[in-house]
């Protein structure tokens, strides 16, 4: 907090915790945030409730420990205001459901996420993200972001995205 002195921090944290705030998502190897646009609730271009989906995702995955931090983005239309394709997990609303993008990231080596599935229902999206995160947590190297992990899957399987679709949708490994 801007202007706070070091000796004030224990008191400040105590007050925040007492008020119901949590700590950890800003620096842990876990979900950092779910960025959302206004979606159909407040935007004339929105075709799905991106804000509601973002809240659902954040509540479901917050605190989940993983090899590295991961970020989500949820855009309510193809204008992509939440920059979903640049996130580890990105959703872009369509009139028929959600397009799910996986393996994006920003930073020094930015990468667009890859289109995993089109026009999926909200229930299917949750199922695919559950499976994706489980598989990532179980197979990625420590401190490996999802974009680099997907590149490693490309090297190992020829097409990392096709491999993920086989594992997560078709359950080719019998783990889902």
Annotate each language-model stretch with its function.
Residues 2-95:
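Small-residue-enriched alpha-helical segments and adjacent helix-cap loops
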Residues 5, 9, 46-50, 54, ...:
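Generic structural signal for well-ordered, non-membrane alpha-helical segments
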Residues 5-8, 12-15, 20, 151-176:
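Terminal amphipathic helices with adjacent charged low-complexity linkers/tails
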Residues 10, 14, 55, 59, ...:
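A broad, structural surface signal
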Residues 17, 21, 62-66, 130-142, ...:
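Generic secondary-structure signature for well-ordered alpha-helical cores
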Residues 26-27, 67-71, 138-152, 163, ...:
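Flexible, glycine/charged-enriched surface loops at secondary-structure junctions
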Residues 33-34, 74-79, 147-161:
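A glycine-rich phosphate-binding loop feature that marks nucleotide/adenosyl-phosphate handling sites
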Residues 71, 76, 80, 85-144, ...:
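Mobile "lid/hinge" segments at catalytic clefts and subdomain interfaces of large enzymes
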């Amino acid at each position: 907090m801007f202007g706070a002195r070091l000796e004030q921090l224990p008191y400040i944290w105590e007050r925040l915790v007492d008020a119901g705030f949590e700590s950890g998502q800003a620096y842990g190897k876990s979900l950092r945030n779910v960025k959302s646009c206004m979606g159909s609730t407040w935007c004339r271009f929105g075709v799905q409730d991106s804000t509601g989906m973002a809240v659902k995702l954040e509540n479901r995955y917050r605190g989940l420990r993983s090899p590295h931090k991961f970020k989500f983005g949820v855009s309510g239309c193809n204008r992509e205001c939440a920059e979903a394709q640049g996130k580890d997990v990105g959703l872009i609303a369509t009139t028929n459901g959600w397009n799910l993008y996986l393996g994006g990231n920003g930073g020094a080596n930015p990468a667009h996420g890859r289109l995993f599935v089109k026009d999926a229902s909200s229930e299917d999206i949750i199922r695919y993200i559950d499976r994706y995160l489980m598989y990532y947590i179980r197979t990625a190297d420590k401190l490996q972001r999802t974009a680099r992990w997907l590149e490693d899957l490309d090297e190992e399987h020829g097409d990392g995205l096709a491999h993920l679709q086989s594992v997560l949708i078709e359950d080719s490994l019998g783990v889902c």
